């Protein structure tokens, strides 16, 4: 019997999301206009809290849908205007171009990245060295590429290796990777160990993207927003953030080493010998079948990667345009000429790009309703040294439960407003920009909500295969969260100001 129109409409609304989630969103949409009539300031904060809720519930429904509905309503009832949203999008066009073109460009270099991580996994036998290598490789790549793409590549490697062993162990050429029923007891034990091994590697790589992503203006989308607000190029951004990012990187790598040595928090599991044998045999077969055309494609991707790093380091063009050049060069020299094949590169980035546009709509509400003005006034009443720590902590707290791009955008806008109003000087603003950048990037590893790369991992096809749940991810990230947050705070408090002053004294950094 066919369902009623009312039931069909309810099922269509937000699709497979739970009924309680749909009811909650409807309640938000009904309450907001009523509160806005009587208390616009309170309604603005309510909207921000609701939007953070949609980000936290990203596994129930992709935040673009509920967040977008909230943003549309905010414009309709007058919390902000379409013109203000357009201005915010225009101001942050470089970030949108970064996501559209850079992520798509790196898609055409996946073969090279897959080759790098495959060689690491099979050529290094020590789990500690392998973990450090994965963390280091992810950090280096994320400093120049998009963290989402780096994680996507590592996920591809892990799913590929998992599938190879699972098919051999279950003696099936086309089996369901979720189905373990055809495995005997011994093979199931080996598979469980392999899952634990992959979980630890994925978490090391995920944290590596945060360690590298904080260092450069292209490492994370919010970095570019902050760099533009401060007027920094690629080199200046790296130098200004270095007094915090470099010590944090060293301590992060040390944490990786200690976790593998102590075998705590789910780390330290070795790659089973039976799995290594299967993977090694498969790799030998694949390498022997690699054609000259495929080898040349790898070389071309390596050269394009060198061009990417060179162009970014010397700021030869806007980041998004460099990404566009990567798309053109990579497709031209690897033989990808079909429109549909090129189109696949954009499917990864465009949903998040659209979500970022919604972020900026919420930022427009925050600006028009002056929501953060009381917080900023409170922070600016503190001493200059304390301001840095407070900005870092406020950013870190919000970034651990919400998306760090959103948080970074909000706080750098407020700091810029304080600069323009004369509440702070240019030197203090630049120090605050570093505190905001590190505050949004480092503590956000606490939960998948804060880091887009972590959320991407949690919602990927790999997560259920290796039994990586939300709770387990938070638990495995905990030691990194504590170390990165505390070391970052100490560096902001004690090393940032003297290091920056020293760079200015010797003429490496110019006073603005």
UniProtKB/Swiss-Prot annotation:
It comes from the Bacteria. The keyword Cell wall biogenesis/degradation does not apply. The chain crosses the membrane at residues 28-48, 52-72, 97-117, 144-164, 201-221, 237-257, 296-330, 347-367, 390-410, 446-466, 474-494. The keyword Transferase does not apply. It catalyses: 2 Na(+)(in) + 3 H(+)(out) = 2 Na(+)(out) + 3 H(+)(in). It holds the Pfam family NhaB. Keywords: Antiport, Cell inner membrane, Cell membrane, Ion transport, Membrane, Sodium, Sodium transport, Transmembrane, Transmembrane helix, Transport. It is found in: Cell inner membrane. Na(+)/H(+) antiporter that extrudes sodium in exchange for external protons. This is Na(+)/H(+) antiporter NhaB. It comes from Enterobacter sp. (strain 638).
């Amino acid at each position: 019997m066919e369902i009623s129109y009312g039931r069909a409409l309810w099922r269509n609304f937000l699709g497979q999301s739970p009924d309680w989630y749909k009811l909650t969103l409807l309640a938000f949409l009904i309450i907001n206009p009523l509160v806005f009539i009587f208390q616009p300031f309170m309604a603005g904060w309510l909207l921000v809290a609701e939007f953070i809720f949609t980000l936290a519930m990203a596994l129930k429904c992709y935040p673009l849908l509920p967040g977008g509905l909230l943003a549309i309503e905010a414009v309709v009832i007058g919390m902000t205007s379409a013109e203000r949203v357009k201005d915010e999008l225009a101001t942050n066009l470089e970030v949108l171009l970064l996501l559209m073109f850079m992520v798509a460009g790196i898609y055409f270099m996946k073969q090279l990245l897959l080759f790098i991580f495959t060689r690491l996994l099979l050529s290094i036998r020590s789990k500690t060295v392998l973990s450090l290598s994965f963390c280091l490789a992810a950090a280096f790549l994320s400093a120049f590429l998009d963290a989402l793409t780096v994680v996507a590549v590592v996920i591809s490697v892990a799913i590929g290796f998992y599938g190879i062993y699972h098919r051999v162990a279950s003696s099936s050429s086309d089996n369901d990777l979720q189905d373990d029923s055809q495995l005997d007891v011994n093979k199931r034990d080996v598979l469980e160990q392999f899952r634990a091994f992959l979980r630890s590697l994925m978490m090391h790589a995920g944290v590596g993207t945060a360690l590298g992503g904080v260092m450069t203006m292209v490492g994370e989308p919010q970095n570019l927003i902050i760099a533009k607000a401060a007027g920094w190029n690629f080199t200046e951004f790296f130098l200004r953030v270095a007094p915090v990012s470099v010590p944090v990187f060293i301590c992060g790598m040390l944490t990786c080493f200690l976790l593998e040595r102590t075998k705590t928090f789910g780390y330290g599991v070795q790659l089973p010998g039976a799995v290594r044998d299967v993977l090694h045999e498969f790799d030998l077969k694949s390498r022997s079948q690699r054609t000259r055309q495929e080898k040349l494609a790898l070389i071309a991707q390596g050269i394009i990667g060198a061009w990417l790093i060179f162009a970014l380091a010397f700021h030869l063009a806007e980041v998004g345009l460099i990404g566009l050049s990567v798309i053109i060069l990579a497709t031209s020299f690897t033989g990808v000429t079909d429109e549909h094949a090129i189109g696949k590169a954009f499917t990864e980035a465009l949903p998040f790009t659209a979500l970022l546009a919604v972020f900026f709509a919420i930022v427009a509400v925050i600006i028009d309703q002056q929501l953060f003005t009381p917080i900023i006034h409170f922070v600016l009443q503190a001493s200059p040294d304390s301001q840095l720590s407070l900005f870092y902590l406020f950013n870190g707290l919000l970034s651990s439960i919400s998306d760090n791009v959103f948080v970074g955008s909000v706080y750098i806008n407020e700091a810029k407003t304080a600069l323009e109003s004369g509440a702070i000087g240019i030197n203090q603003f630049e120090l605050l920009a570093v505190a905001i950048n590190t505050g949004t990037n480092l503590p956000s590893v606490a939960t998948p909500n804060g880091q887009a790369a972590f959320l991407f991992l949690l919602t990927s096809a790999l997560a259920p295969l290796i039994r990586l749940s939300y709770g387990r991810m938070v638990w495995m990230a905990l030691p990194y969260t504590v170390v990165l947050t505390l070391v970052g705070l100490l560096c902001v408090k004690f090393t940032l100001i003297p290091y920056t002053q020293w760079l200015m004294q010797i003429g490496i950094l110019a006073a603005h």
